[in-house]
Amino acid sequence: MIRTEEMLLNVGPQHPSTHGVFRLVIKIDGEIIKEATPVIGYLHRGTEKIAESLQYTQIIPYTDRMDYLSAMTNNYVICHAVETMMGLEIPERAEYLRVLAMELGRIASHLVWWGTNLLDIGAVSPFLYAFREREMIINLLNELCGARLTFNYMRVGGVKWDAPDGWIEKVEEFVPYMREQLAGYHDLVSGNEIFLNRVKGVGIYSAEEAISYSLSGANLRCTGVNWDLRKDEPYSIYDRFDFHIPVGSVGDAWDRYVCRMQEIEESLKIVEQAVQQFPKEGAVLAKVPKIIKAPKGEAFVRIESPRGEIGCYIASDGKKEPYRLKFRRPSFYNLQILPKLLKGENIANLITILGGVDIVLGEVDG
């Protein structure tokens, strides 16, 4: 008589394929996952509570450490929320610098996802190529703000520093280079039969399920939902650029891959246009008081980060610190669908599905 029993398996919290301190407790019967339970909180630092005792400018460095792979968009969302409350008009040159910084950051973030996701499923070379190009972007951002990862570049009213001499020209030269490398990525990976067998038909969910789980970003668009805040609710100067939003149709790991790869191409279009339209001169910071006090009231803003919709809610009582601060962190919401995706899957697909969701634990835990 054959007898089977379920086995409890811990993935993490230090497993290399979780890309952070994330633990996944799974029950398996043979090689089939019966249940998956994410365990989070290992990187929780209480950012929102700490912010209640900080001035608005002091909060910006804390946002760098949420989604640390896309710190510029985190910088922007807190500044945008305060600027909305204060009714500030941002200098045009500062807006272009912000867009350039955010879109370069988006490309760098997707490169990390591409390289590490493929490394997890056994392809080593793409990881090396991805980090080669990412290093070029990091060097550009380092020249702009003096930091490689946690930038603290944006300010309420604009940005901290203007671009150094020759920086715009370097960004302009990077665009055609990156396009050429991107074509090489597709030649290397996108048509590879082994890779396609690992991602096609794996981790499928519908548009209705994506919406019910509050998914956003590529995790939503892979199901065919055409929704991107840069297009649908334009902020900053995104309405000045010509670009389209990549969408999928099936909602599997392959569609998520295609959406993110095409997003790199669209970000390059935005960067190219921003360089062409970049103002020759002008201020990079609006006239704001040294001690910023948001007027009494509430504001909620949301923008499109590489992982989806990141939002910032501020309740102010008129003081120099927020009365309440709340972030909508897309990685936290995107993670919620993971147990549903893993149930009934072969354990070999676990890392493929987890990598396709593309979470950052600093953002999940907050």
From Swiss-Prot:
One Pfam family, short name: Complex1_49kDa
Record field: catalytic activity: a quinone + NADH + 5 H(+)(in) = a quinol + NAD(+) + 4 H(+)(out)
Broadest EC class assigned to this enzyme: translocase
GO cellular component, one term: plasma membrane
Membrane-protein topology: Peripheral membrane protein
InterPro entries registered for this protein in UniProt: NADH_Q_OxRdtase_suD (IPR001135), NDH1_su_D/H (IPR022885), NiFe-Hase_large (IPR029014)
Keywords: Cell membrane, Membrane, NAD, Quinone, Translocase, Transport
Listed EC numbers: 7.1.1.-
Cell compartments where the protein resides: Cell membrane
Listed GO MF terms: NAD binding; NADH:ubiquinone reductase (non-electrogenic) activity; quinone binding
Subunit structure: NDH-1 is composed of 14 different subunits. Subunits NuoB, C, D, E, F, and G constitute the peripheral sector of the complex.
Family note: Belongs to the complex I 49 kDa subunit family.
General function of this protein: NDH-1 shuttles electrons from NADH, via FMN and iron-sulfur (Fe-S) centers, to quinones in the respiratory chain. The immediate electron acceptor for the enzyme in this species is believed to be a menaquinone. Couples the redox reaction to proton translocation (for every two electrons transferred, four hydrogen ions are translocated across the cytoplasmic membrane), and thus conserves the redox energy in a proton gradient.
HAMAP family in the cross-refs: NDH1_NuoD (MF_01358)
Protein name per UniProt: NADH-quinone oxidoreductase subunit D
Protein species of origin: Bacillus thuringiensis subsp. konkukian (strain 97-27)
Lineage: Bacteria, Bacillati, Bacillota, Bacilli, Bacillales
